Each structure stands twice: as structure tokens, then as C-alpha cells.
Amino acid sequence: MAVSESQLKKMMSKYKYRDLTVRQTVNVIAMYKDLKPVLDSYVFNDGSSRELVNLTGTIPVRYRGNIYNIPICLWLLDTYPYNPPICFVKPTSSMTIKTGKHVDANGKIYLPYLHDWKHPRSELLELIQIMIVIFGEEPPVFSRPTVSASYPPYTAAGPPNTSYLPSMPSGISAYPSGYPPNPSGYPGCPYPPAGPYPATTSSQYPSQPPVTTAGPSRDGTISEDTIRASLISAVSDKLRWRMKEEMDGAQAELNALKRTEEDLKKGHQKLEEMVTRLDQEVAEVDKNIELLKKKDEELSSALEKMENQSENNDIDEVIIPTAPLYKQILNLYAEENAIEDTIFYLGEALRRGVIDLDVFLKHVRLLSRKQFQLRALMQKARKTAGLSDLY
């Protein structure tokens, strides 16, 4: 049963880059139906373990004209795709690992592509396609010889009785100086813990060729058309995803630019309104300046005229009310303030002992009565003139 994208997200819930990892895994499963995602415990060299997702199953490899299913297991670290997957060949009981420059005795796979792994240039689908090409040139497993057979055992790595690459010590690859000891943040990567591999009978490798009944060719080479087709497929898939990512990025940038353009248009409209308002205010200010200049000239002329006439003018004649009622109010106000000053100075005279208390009280009583009458009359006159109350 195929695993859905939601199930993958649940399995990879602890992955740092879950959505990206799920997307690449879905692409691989869609192209290679035999690979199934499994959540299992991976044991590192230091004995620590971690729950990781692995892709377990077979990939089709064309060797000498026939297609064989090579069992593999790809462990995806929780920092994928910034760390490469840990890849193993998973031979069945009827198979034997053929050690070489790409596979060690434990079945661990070493490839230049894994060594040079760098996101976003490297991805899982392209890795599998490169494995198919390399395993087509140098198969990582071959079938065990059977004692009861009356014919020489057939091997997937070459003709019968041909010499195989000598077994390499466990953990040693053909790239001694290039591969990092282990992915960043993880201990070493040994062979995964032993566990049952999905049922695969001995007849699956070498499998019955699904596309031809002819026996494998004996020339020991893989056709250039096959390599070219695999590389073209890998490159086209990668270009397709790169183009999609670029298109998505360009669309997001275009949307952001559109929003910025709208904001700029709104800002431009506000600035135009502000400039129009400022122009109106400047025109109003210029008008007020002209008016003030005229008034200033009038005041200067009046002051100059008054200075020339000040020597011949009496101060009492200068202040002349425009109506008799206003003149009466002015006289009443002046007289009332004079009485106020008189009462003040009488108090000062009493304090200094110039006059007696009886004299002070007598004059104050008379002045206060007079002041009251003046205030009452002035209040009535102001009311008649339409002025506000003074007291």
C-alpha cells in the first residue's frame, strides 16, 4: 500500500526540514514503486540510536542487456537535505556483497555524489539515478553458487569464474581522503541494526529479464544510450524542479513588488495632497505677509505723525471717546480708581500715625459711599452700551 504524503509528514514530524524532505521522498516513491518508507531505529557507531526514516526496496539496474532488481536501503537523517543520506546495499540470503570502490564489506555505499553532497544542488532522486548508472557498470551484489547446480553459477558482476574485485576491509572506501568521517552532528554511520528485509526470494537476482529473453551480453560494457538516457532523465528532473523553484521564487518576488508598487502609489497620492495643501498654505501666508506689511506701514506713518504732534498735544485731549456714553464710562472709571487710591493712602497715613483713627474712619466712610455710587452708575452705563459686567 502506498504511503500518503500526510503519513510521511507524521513519520518525519521530528525532521528539521520536514516539508522539503517529504516532497523529495514523494518524488522518489512516485518514480520507483518498490521503494517504501519505513520508520525505524538507526544505531550509530557510539551505540546511540535515533528514530529515522529509511527508503527500503529495490531499484532496477540494467546490466549486460538485462534488468535486475538491486536491494538498497537509504537512511534519511533528520537534518536532510543538508546532510546526505546513509546508503546501504541489502542483499538477500541468496546474494553476496561484491566489495569494490563503491561498496564495502558491510554493504555501505560510497559515491562521489555523496561526498560532494550540497543542498540544493543535490537531491535524493538524482542520487538514485546515479546509483542505477554506476551499479549497471559494477553490480554491488552477485548470487551465491548452488552446490546442486550442474552448471557454473551465474554472477551479476561478470562472466562465470571471472575474478571479482578483492574484498576491502570493512569501512574502507576507494575515496580515503575525500569522504568526511560522518555527517555533521552525528556519530559514525555503521551498518544499520539487523532486521528482516522485505521478502525477496533468491529468484529475484538475477531476476528474469522483464524486457528481453536474451541472455546477458558478454562484452562487459554498458551501452552509451543507457547511460545517456539515465543522465538525461536525472538532469531533466532536476531542471524541472529547479525551474519550478525559480518560478515560485519569481512569483513570490513579483507579488511582493506589486504590493510595494501599490504602497508607493498610495504614498505618492498622499504626497501630492500634502504638496497641494502646503501650496495653499504658502499662498495664504504670502497674502497675510502683504497685509501685515501694509498695516506696518500705516502704523509707522501714524507713529511718525504722532511724534511730530506730541509736543503740542494735551494727554487729556488725546483720549477722546467716540460717544458721550463712552466718555461718561471713562470718567466714572477714572474717578472710581482715584477714590480707591485715596483710601489706600489714608490707610498708609493711619499706619504711620499721621492721622487718627476717627479721622480715617470718617473719610473712608464718605469715600466708600461715593465709590459705591460711582460703581453702580458705571455698571448701568456699561449695560446700556452693551459691554460686559466689570464686577
Swiss-Prot record:
Which keywords belong to this entry? Acetylation, Cell cycle, Cell division, Coiled coil, Cytoplasm, Cytoskeleton, Endosome, Growth regulation, Membrane, Nucleus, Phosphoprotein, Protein transport, Transport, Ubl conjugation
Question: Which residues lie within the region annotated Disordered?
Answer: 195-222
Q: Name the Gene Ontology molecular function terms of this record.
A: calcium-dependent protein binding; protein homodimerization activity; protein-containing complex binding; transcription corepressor activity; ubiquitin binding; ubiquitin protein ligase binding; virion binding
- Where in the cell? Cytoplasm; Early endosome membrane; Late endosome membrane; Cytoplasm, Cytoskeleton, Microtubule organizing center, Centrosome
- Residue ranges constituting the SB domain according to the UniProt record: 323-391
Q: What positions carry the motif PTAP motif?
A: 321-324
- SUPFAM superfamilies xrefs: Endosomal sorting complex assembly domain, UBC-like
Give residue numbers for the modification (N-acetylalanine): A2
Q: How does it sit in the membrane?
A: Peripheral membrane protein
Signal peptide positions (record): none
Location of Phosphothreonine modifications: T221
Task: Spell out the protein name for this chain.
Answer: Tumor susceptibility gene 101 protein
Recorded name of the encoding gene: Tsg101
